[in-house]
Amino acid sequence: RQGQTVYEKDADSKRYPASTTKIMTYIIAVENIADLDNTKIPIKQSVLDVLKNTGSSLANVENHVGKSMTAIDLLYSMMVPSGNDAAMVLADYIGEGNVDNFVKLMNEKAKELGCENTHFANPDGLHDPDHYTTARDMYKITTYALTLPRFEEITNTCTYTCDGDDTALVTTNYLIDANRGGEYYYMYA
């Protein structure tokens, strides 16, 4: 039966979610931006500077500083190569210049979805002792995300080229990439 747990181990143990955080960031972005294809979001150097020297995975959003990117391009930039830069730009935009406002929305949504052991401290998943979730809570978050527009489409994308870019973004999800996934590739993922 769909939705039935087949096996679980330590489903309620707190863990650091790392880049799976971006699933909640996706949720908040899609729920707060009405027109993903036409909403232009300014790319500010000050937002990207926060990620310097963090070892962050990036999606080359910096190439657009001083210009704008569409919300949909930023969502692909966040989800396909796990771009922390795109996550921060979306959070800054929706939080009206304050990423903490965005993180508050993330935590409110987690509660609304019935998450009992989740607390977010940032939109990108960089380590913070106060940034945690459980497998059970992440299941609730992901199950909800799958009901939202374009989530499945974006997360099943292996390469994507943003408007105005020459270089394609490449997925970090080896489960779906037959060319780069090697032993991790799973054709039914």
Range-by-range predicted roles:
Residues R1-R136, A145-L146:
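Active-site-adjacent loops and short helices of periplasmic peptidoglycan-processing enzymes
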Residues C115-H119, H127-A189:
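Domain-terminus/edge residues, biased toward the C-terminal soluble/receptor-binding domains
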